[in-house]
């Protein structure tokens, strides 16, 4: 069981176009491929890595905080899917389990004591082989 690198930052926005324009035009990230989720958004890449995920909340009742933006969660690459589930349960933490459309990525979501959402991403092929 181990924890890997920070994979991406997720930002909720009520102005997706301006947000994409800033991060691509001003900062130099690249707007790229994104799974076919049921909600609108964009994935921005640095090289081959989707380091920023944007979620468009303009058509919802949810509002992004304007002070610093609205950072939704922090994500890490991980391995040991079943071990993490057992450990989190054993420590009394509730978690949510998800599979990304296409099935190549398994995820666990858990909140820290401050309410910050932590996303753990597991390569499904590696987990099945373990």
Segments from the language model and where they lie:
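Core segments of cupin and vicinal oxygen chelate
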Residues: 12-51
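Vicinal oxygen chelate
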Residues: 2, 85-86, 90-130
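N-terminal beta-strand motif that seeds the catalytic metal site of vicinal oxygen chelate
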Residues: 1-17, 71-74, 126-130
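Exposed loop/turn and edge beta-strand positions of beta-sandwich/beta-sheet ligand-binding modules
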Residues: 5, 38, 70, 104
């Amino acid at each position: 069981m181990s924890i890997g690198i920070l994979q991406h930052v997720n930002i909720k926005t009520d102005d997706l176009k301006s947000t994409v324009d800033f991060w691509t035009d001003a900062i130099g990230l690249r707007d790229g491929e994104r799974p076919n989720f049921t909600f609108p958004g964009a994935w921005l890449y640095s090289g081959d890595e989707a380091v920023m995920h944007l979620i468009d909340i303009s058509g919802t009742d949810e509002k992004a905080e304007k002070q610093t933006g609205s950072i939704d969660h922090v994500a890490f690459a991980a391995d040991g899917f079943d071990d993490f589930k057992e450990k989190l349960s054993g420590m009394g933490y509730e978690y949510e389990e998800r599979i990304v459309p296409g099935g190549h990525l398994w995820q666990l979501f858990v909140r820290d004591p401050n309410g910050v959402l932590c996303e753990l991403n597991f390569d499904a092929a590696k987990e099945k082989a373990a």
